[in-house]
Amino acid sequence: MRVMHIRTFASAIAATLLLVPAYAHQSRWGSADDKTAKYIVEMERKWAEGVCVDNGVVANLLADDFQGTSTQGARFTKADELKDEKSVRTAHDCGLDEAKVHFFGNSMAVVYGSEHAVGKDKSQPNAKVCQVWTDTWLKRGGSWQIIASHDNRVKCP
């Protein structure tokens, strides 16, 4: 009888250990009332607005090992973004148009978004520039940060 209880207990533990990773990687879309999704969207908004003004968001927003791909296909790092954040700005009317957060477990999210700015293209100072992007967020040490970003310039609506 005791052996049967031990086997039942061992089976329950094994099943739990197998199911926990499956549960942890379930995906879900962030809802309007999700506190973490709201935080992520707000930080994305600040980064989009940071094209126009130095709002100091980059230092905490991007992970130290961040890698991005620009609209021209060039790679950039957190150090590149910090330098860019301190440079002279020509853009105005910067803003976030859309951001949708898709969570994968409790520590990873992918954000699909779009933004705009006027005057970002120095060769056309009055032209509106629009881009869509995908940012990958990771929660490490209790903090959410962007670890990767890919930008793509698109025709403005």
Outline where the language-model segments fall.
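A beta-strand edge to alpha-helix "cap/lid" segment located at domain peripheries
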Residues: Y23-P157
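Bacterial N-terminal signal peptides
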Residues: S11-V20
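Bacterial N-terminal signal peptides that target proteins for export
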Residues: R2-A12
